[in-house]
């Protein structure tokens, strides 16, 4: 089946200035935007130190699918998309997947991010803020793009994070003015360390601290340490589950499986995105799934965790699956959704059909449907 592609008549000029910073980008990772007193303190670097590198559009940035060959459209893209199509949709041989994944470091989005790394190993001269150009969020994007484990630039960035953090009995924080550990940041740094192969004994200590912070409902919450909250946060819980899963699948020495199972039960009890008391949607934003998700929870990110963990297809997740199906367009793609406000090094996709949304939705639906048929 042949596909037709339509190009925009005029390419959008490359950005030479940072994207506008929205205050919501600095909100604490909780169930709702945090008040100003609960926002992460910025690092020493200021917004004026962030410089965006102008990047010209590439042909696949401008293409629009008008036929039904979605698979070919997905493959006509960046290596970060292609290797994940090979791995998750095609189930291609490992050597095919690995060969394509290696290209993330030398072509496209991955190469662009690596090119703007500072000589000292940071990004934007800062560890956690500004969002989303700091070292933490640049490394998170490289993780989602699939930069291979052991890449020297990622290891240098991880070293800066782990050496620059403040430690509190295993938990850590990157903010200079908050003298308490932060669960989301601890989880993100564990995820990055295990994703890129950063070897540090403090990783095990951080994992043990995360295990100790699990709440009786199975979730985690950044505000437990600060405010004594005893109800899990969707945002904190998904970040912690992703970290524990990566720790377990990369040979971590601590037993985390039971804690992860209880964390997934937390989401099942909430039908993934609803109040366990009223059944109402906790936040309408949970039903949208921009890429990258940053520290935010959404239904696709939640289901991606269940997929990668090959967890049970709990019937209480069916509601969220239906929401994703309903978002599919008539051309069998899913549209680009507005990203979380903040600064970006460059735009990943233009408005219209989104390869990231389509890839992520398709592999979640395939996982669900395969399990139901079995």
Description of each model-found segment:
Residues 2-12, 19, 43, 47-374:
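Preference for long, amphipathic alpha-helical scaffolds in soluble/luminal domains
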Residues 22-31, 38, 43, 47:
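Asp/Glu-rich intrinsically disordered low-complexity tracts
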């Amino acid at each position: 089946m042949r596909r037709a592609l339509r190009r925009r008549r005029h390419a959008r000029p490359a950005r030479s200035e940072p994207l506008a910073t929205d205050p919501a980008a600095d909100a604490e990772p909780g169930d709702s935007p945090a008040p100003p007193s609960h926002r992460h303190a910025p690092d020493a670097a200021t917004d004026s130190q962030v410089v965006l590198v102008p990047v010209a559009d590439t042909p696949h940035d401008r293409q629009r699918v008008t036929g039904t060959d979605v698979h070919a459209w997905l493959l006509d893209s960046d290596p970060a998309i292609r290797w994940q199509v090979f791995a998750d949709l095609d189930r291609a041989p490992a050597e095919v997947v690995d060969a394509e994944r290696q290209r993330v470091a030398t072509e496209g989005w991955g190469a662009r991010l690596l090119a703007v790394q500072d000589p000292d190993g940071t990004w934007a001269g800062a560890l956690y803020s500004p969002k989303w150009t700091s070292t933490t969020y640049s490394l998170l994007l490289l993780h989602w793009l699939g930069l291979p484990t052991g890449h020297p630039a990622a290891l240098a960035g991880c070293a800066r994070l782990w050496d620059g953090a403040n430690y509190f009995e295993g938990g850590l924080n990157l903010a200079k003015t908050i003298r308490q550990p932060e669960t989301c940041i601890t989880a993100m740094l564990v995820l990055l360390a295990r994703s890129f192969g950063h070897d540090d004994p403090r990783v095990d200590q951080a994992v043990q601290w995360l295990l100790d912070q699990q709440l009786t409902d199975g979730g985690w919450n950044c505000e437990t340490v600060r405010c004594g909250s005893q109800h899990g946060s969707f945002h904190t819980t998904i970040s912690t589950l992703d970290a524990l899963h990566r720790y377990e699948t990369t040979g971590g020495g601590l037993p985390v499986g039971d804690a992860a199972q209880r964390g997934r039960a937390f989401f099942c009890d909430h039908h993934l995105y609803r109040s366990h008391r009223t059944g109402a949607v906790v936040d309408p934003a949970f039903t949208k799934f921009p890429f990258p998700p940053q520290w935010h929870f959404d239904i696709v990110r939640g289901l991606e965790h269940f997929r990668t963990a090959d967890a049970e297809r709990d019937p209480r997740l069916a509601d969220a699956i239906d929401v994703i199906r309903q978002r599919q367009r008539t051309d069998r793609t899913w549209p680009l959704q507005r990203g979380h406000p903040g600064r970006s090094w460059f735009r990943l996709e233009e408005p219209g059909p989104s390869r990231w949304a389509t890839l992520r939705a398709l592999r979640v639906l395939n996982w669900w449907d395969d399990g139901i048929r079995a």
